[in-house]
Each structure stands twice: as structure tokens, then as C-alpha cells.
């Protein structure tokens, strides 16, 4: 196995090439002793909030507090790792200078040329992969264990997912050099309101599971997956789904929706 490291825009990119020539790229932000201490300090600083929030989330989703705390830590440290999905190419105008010499005097003439820009599309472990895996756990383990009418429960989650997806996709915009952005409060508020309306219908269903799963997966699909075709408009060398880690919309939507739901249910 071949291991290559490339530095791009302040990030260290580790490339792993298998025996069959398939490339798997892990992208790490620069890790240092200072940064690790910063993460540790951040964890300790947020500990009172984590205990309080963890108990609410644990009670709401009926998950042990230790598991919630472990998910947060994994998301925190997993936010430094991005897994490559594919590579997109687009034709972009590039400003170049052509040198002309006239009677010993050199002139630099600016002109536009077109070149191929490569953009790496990746998934952030902490900001997207872990929340999605946790959502799948709630879907295929928690709901069958807690709900009496699985058809109704899954239908409510699906409706909430569709509502969040449509609203988020409508408001999501590509930001040059940054990524796909959407107003922060829109996804969790939409998920919470949809859950508040849906959970008492026919048979009562855990509203917090509806809000978390519908909000997390709806934000992922509406903001990121449905906008993959707009990657060429961003013009960034790397686009990471959930790339802001624990501060990303995919990660925060489910958690924030739970807190909003506590206020309105």
C-alpha cells in the first residue's frame, strides 16, 4: 500500500493507494500538540453543557447518557477526518499574463484563459458520517424497540424527512470558495415543527426521534446531496459534506431540533 501526503491550503491530505490501484484519500486538518490540547480544553469547557444536554438528548431519544457522550467525543475528533467520495472537474476562467518584448522593453499583457479545476468531494466523519449512522441506529433499532405501530412511525419520519429536504433545498445556496450554505435556524426549526404536528397523529410516536432523524437526513439530502451539481460554481479545491464538524448544519440540526421541540411540545 502506498501512502502519500500532500499539503493543500493548510490541510494535510493523506493518500492511500491499494494494490489494485484504487485510491482512498483521507484529508486531515493539521494536528499538533497545541490543537489536541485545544480540543481537550474545549471538551472540558463544554462538560457542564454536555452533561445537561446529554441528559436531555438521552431522555428524549431513550439512549444511555454514556452513549450520547461517546457520540459527541467521536464527532469532535472525527471532525478532523474527511473521506473522499469522488473528484469533480469543471472548466474555470484563469487570469494569466503574457509577456511581450518590444525594443528591449518587456510588457505583461493580462488575458483570460480556461483551465480545468479539480474539486475533491468528501464526507466529514464527525459532521456527517456519525450523525447519519446514529440516525440509522434510531431508525432500525430504537423505533422497532420502542414503537408499537412501525408503519405509522416510519411514515411520520419519512414525511418529516421530505418536508425538511424540500425546505432546506429551496433555501440552500452555493457560496463561492466556501460550500453550500443555508440559514442555520431553518433546518432545526422545520424539523421541530414538522415533528410537533406529526407525532400525535393516529398513534403517538416519539417526537424527538422524528425530529432528529428527519432533520439530520433531510438537511444532508436537501443542502448537500441535491446540490452536488452546483459544485462547479463553488470553485473550491475541496468540498466536504459536514465539513464544519460539530458546528456543521447536518450535525447541529438534529440536536437543536430536540431542544426546540422541548419548548413547543
List PLM regions with ranges.
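N-terminal amphipathic/basic-hydrophobic helices that include classical n-h-c signal peptides
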Residues: 1-15
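Membrane-water interface at loop-to-transmembrane-helix junctions
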Residues: 112-129, 151-153, 178, 241-247
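A glycine-rich, hydrophobic loop/mini-helix early in the fold
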Residues: 86-136
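C-terminal ends of transmembrane helices
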Residues: 51-55, 80-89, 109-111, 166-177, ...
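Membrane-embedded alpha-helical segments in integral membrane proteins
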Residues: 44-56, 132-142
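Glycine/small-residue-rich interface belts in oligomeric ring/scaffold proteins
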Residues: 63-89
Amino acid at each position: 500500500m502506498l501512502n502519500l501526503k500532500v499539503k493543500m491550503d493548510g490541510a494535510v491530505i493523506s493518500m492511500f493507494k491499494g494494490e489494485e490501484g484504487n485510491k482512498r484519500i483521507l484529508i486531515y486538518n493539521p494536528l499538533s500538540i497545541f490543537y489536541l490540547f485545544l480540543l481537550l480544553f474545549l471538551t472540558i469547557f463544554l462538560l457542564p453543557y454536555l452533561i445537561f444536554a446529554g441528559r436531555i438528548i438521552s431522555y428524549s431519544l431513550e439512549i444511555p447518557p454514556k452513549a450520547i457522550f461517546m457520540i459527541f467525543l467521536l464527532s469532535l475528533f472525527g471532525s478532523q477526518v474527511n473521506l473522499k467520495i469522488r473528484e469533480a472537474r469543471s472548466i474555470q476562467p484563469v487570469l494569466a499574463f503574457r509577456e511581450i518584448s518590444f525594443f528591449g522593453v518587456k510588457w505583461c499583457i493580462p488575458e483570460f484563459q480556461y483551465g480545468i479545476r479539480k474539486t475533491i468531494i468528501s464526507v466529514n466523519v464527525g459532521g456527517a458520517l456519525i450523525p447519519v449512522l446514529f440516525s440509522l441506529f434510531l431508525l432500525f433499532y430504537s423505533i422497532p424497540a420502542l414503537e408499537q405501530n412501525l408503519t405509522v412511525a416510519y411514515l411520520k419520519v419519512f414525511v418529516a424527512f421530505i418536508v425538511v429536504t424540500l425546505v432546506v433545498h429551496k433555501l440552500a445556496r452555493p457560496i463561492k470558495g466556501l460550500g453550500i450554505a443555508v440559514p442555520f435556524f431553518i433546518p432545526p426549526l422545520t424539523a421541530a415543527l414538522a415533528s410537533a404536528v406529526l407525532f400525535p397523529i393516529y398513534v403517538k410516536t416519539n417526537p424527538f426521534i422524528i425530529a432528529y432523524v428527519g432533520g439530520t437526513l433531510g438537511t444532508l439530502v436537501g443542502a448537500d446531496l441535491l446540490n452536488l451539481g452546483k459544485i462547479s460554481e463553488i470553485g473550491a479545491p475541496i468540498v466536504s459534506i459536514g465539513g464544519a464538524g460539530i458546528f456543521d448544519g447536518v450535525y447541529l440540526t438534529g440536536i437543536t431540533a430536540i431542544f426546540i421541540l422541548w419548548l413547543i411540545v
